[in-house]
Amino acid sequence: MMENLQVNQREKKTRHSSRQCRRKGLVPGVIYGKGINNFLFEIGELELNHALSVTGEHGLLSINSQEGSLNTLIKEVQRDPVTRRVLHIDLEKVEGNEEIETAVPINYVGEEYINKLDAVLQKNLDSIKVKCSPSNIPKGVNLNVGRAKPGDQFKIADVEFGNEITVVDDLNSIVASVSYDQKIITQEVVDQEVAENRAKKES
């Protein structure tokens, strides 16, 4: 799904101007790509947040401005590490239905079942790079880890994509692995040592 957004052109590209922009409830951004000069813009934070909730952070946006309309791909969303508010957004112009490379977020499904095993899921990747036409970009891809047990690993090859999508990343790359929770193991060892010491004192 492609969201339509109205943006306003901005002239300056300085830290001060970006801070001023954010104080007004606006988010600074840039559009770049083949055949165009970098286009600096600002957009309402609320409008952008709504669009990101629909498309995800690697989806498509139709941008309307004084210069006309452009179809774009979200390339990067910079967020404040504490508040998670959007600080800046980078967009790339896309041409028709020409294939493009983008990152697709991984949704880990069934992680709660791993936690019940006193185990943890170690996530090596949060997205996978793919190549496809703009209309076929998925908002995300699911990886079911619900039946995994400690020692299991998941590779990119274990993630299912449609035939219209080509995976760019190495299929043998480890996406995630399951291991015992070291905190629980450590606590069990401590409890055992305490029990053994108590038994020695009582004997």
UniProtKB/Swiss-Prot annotation:
GO terms for cellular component: cytosolic large ribosomal subunit. The keyword rRNA-binding applies. One of its GO terms (molecular function) is 5S rRNA binding. It holds the Pfam family Ribosomal_L25p. One of its GO terms (biological process) is translation. Coiled coil: none annotated. It comes from the Bacteria. Residues 12-21 have a biased composition (Basic residues). Keywords: Ribonucleoprotein, Ribosomal protein, RNA-binding, rRNA-binding. Residues 1-21 are annotated as: Disordered. InterPro entries: Rbsml_bL25/Gln-tRNA_synth_N, Ribosomal_bL25/Gln-tRNA_synth, Ribosomal_bL25_b-dom, Ribosomal_bL25_C, Ribosomal_bL25_long, Ribosomal_L25_dom, Ribosomal_uL5_bac-type. Part of the 50S ribosomal subunit; part of the 5S rRNA/L5/L18/L25 subcomplex. Contacts the 5S rRNA. Binds to the 5S rRNA independently of L5 and L18. This is one of the proteins that binds to the 5S RNA in the ribosome where it forms part of the central protuberance. PANTHER family: RIBOSOMAL PROTEIN L25/GLN-TRNA SYNTHETASE, ANTI-CODON-BINDING DOMAIN-CONTAINING PROTEIN, RIBOSOMAL PROTEIN L25_GLN-TRNA SYNTHETASE, ANTI-CODON-BINDING DOMAIN-CONTAINING PROTEIN. NCBIfam families: bL25_bact_ctc (TIGR00731). Belongs to the bacterial ribosomal protein bL25 family. CTC subfamily. This is Large ribosomal subunit protein bL25. The gene is rplY.
